[in-house]
Design a protein with these regions (language model features):
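Membrane-proximal intracellular helices of multi-pass ion channels
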Residues: 1-445
Length: 445
């Protein structure tokens, strides 16, 4: 048996996921280093190529070079492929090639596909994977067609490529854009702040990509019968609606007071959708108030939903923590939502994920603030954007040193593969003790 196969047999699911994502990132970085990937046909420094490849595979959107003005058509195509692989997941994309080639999917592969999709069971996972691939490509195609007239009007024939690229980037919640120029880099979609077609299409793609593949399947199976949905789908759809509506009202009333009513509404809606977790922007985040930035950090931290293209701690994690708090207030033993009781493991996992992401984002912000002598609040914005795989920035990332960029690379990688995945992979060899220790009460609060 070849050595690589022996190694693969020894790896558990969590370790193999990490290695596959790392391999795709390194291959992407190697391609981006090539002179053909840059507009000026020069070699891009490896650390910049690695940062960009990590951001693409982890569907983040933080960049150190402007995507449109630095990368050539080849480089942009590489980025789009990396975004697609990162958005759908390495295992999902790999399984799709197996399905296309007619190869039989083994039981171990089905188990990995189940984990990648966050599916409740192995049964029907091949059918679900095929549905996800077909639906993803269809939605991206529809998104590109919707934006095509606007971009072709403004850019001519090259507008076709821009429509396709932005559709893939939006659906995969990546946030990479092709709007910058050498004179005006990193402008994102600010030129389209009042354009309803671009705003609504990008927003719709972000939301659909961020609600999760299982939610799609639930809606397809049960149509609009909300009461028939799985508990997870109910929580995701409710949380998503609230996390769009409430921030939109805040931005409308307190942040965006200039311009026409339509422009204010589009700005408010877009800035409530994109932090979870796309990274496009139609407004300058440096012009927001401290409260507006704080709300954006909170939205980035929560992110999208499990089994989706989005990052963050996930809407379900936030919902379980809130439900558990209400259960404590009411002196209930278990949190409840929609007439169902939460399992204890979900509460423990939610608390662990919240703690891990909070500690990592704060630690990263402290280190970057110290190394770069920058305000802590601005560094926290960047680190939260990285670990939640968002891509929004206050303009700091392109000017950070190699150490600080390395921290952001680590946070982006953690955010995409999952904090618990990293922990489980690291502790795979350890065995938990079966002994039950004596219990003792400790006062909290």
């Amino acid at each position: 048996m070849p050595s690589y196969r022996r190694l693969a047999c020894k790896l558990n699911y969590f370790q193999s996921i990490i290695l596959m994502f790392a391999a795709v990132i390194l291959i992407g970085a190697a391609l981006l280093v090539l002179p053909i990937s840059a507009q000026e046909r020069t070699v891009t420094p490896f650390h910049e190529a690695l940062f960009t490849a990590t951001s693409a595979v982890c569907v983040t959107g933080l960049v150190v070079r402007d995507t449109a003005s630095h990368w050539s058509a080849f480089g942009q195509a590489v980025l789009m492929v990396l975004i697609q692989i990162g958005g759908l997941g390495v295992i999902t994309v790999g399984a799709s090639f197996s399905l296309l080639s007619g190869r039989r999917i083994s039981l171990s592969q089905r188990g990995r596909m189940q984990e990648a999709m966050s599916a409740p069971k192995v049964g029907g996972i091949v059918r679900l994977t095929g549905f996800v691939i077909r639906t993803s490509l269809m939605i991206e195609g529809i998104g590109a067609l919707c934006m095509l007239p606007v971009f072709c009007r403004d850019f001519g024939v090259s507008g076709i490529w821009k429509a396709v690229f932005h559709s893939v980037s939006a659906f995969c919640n990546a946030g990479f854009d092709l709007m910058g120029t050498p004179d005006m880099p990193f402008v994102s979609l600010t030129a389209y702040r009042a354009d309803p077609v671009i705003n609504l299409t990008i927003s719709a793609l972000i939301v659909v990509g961020g609600v999760g593949f299982l939610t799609w399947d639930d809606v397809r199976t049960n149509r609009l019968c909300f009461h028939r949905y799985r508990l997870q789908s109910k929580v995701i759809l409710t949380a998503t609606a609230l996390l769009i509506l409430l921030p939109t009202l805040y931005f409308l009333w307190f942040e965006f007071k200039g311009g026409t009513q339509r422009e204010r509404l589009l700005l408010s809606l877009f800035q409530s959708v994109t932090p979870r977790t796309a990274g496009f922007n139609t407004a300058d985040y440096t012009s927001l108030s401290s409260s507006g930035r704080g709300l954006t950090i909170l939205l980035m931290f929560i992110g999208g939903s499990p089994g989706s293209t989005a990052g963050g701690i996930k809407t379900t994690t936030a919902a379980v923590l809130v439900a558990n708090a209400f259960a404590v207030f009411r002196r209930q033993k278990s949190p409840e939502m929609f007439g169902r009781r939460m399992e204890e493991k979900a509460v423990h996992d939610a608390a662990a994920i919240f703690t891990l992401y909070l500690v990592l984002s704060l630690t990263g912000a402290f280190v970057i603030s110290t190394v770069e002598t920058l305000p802590l609040s601005e560094c926290l914005f960047e680190t939260t954007s990285a670990i939640a795989t968002v891509g929004l920035s206050l303009g700091l990332t392109p000017h950070l040193g190699i150490v600080s960029q390395g921290i952001l690379i680590f946070l982006m990688f953690i955010g995409r593969v999952g904090g618990l995945t990293m922990i489980y992979a690291a502790l795979s060899g350890s065995k938990s003790s079966a002994a039950r220790l004596p219990q003792e009460r400790i006062t909290v609060g």
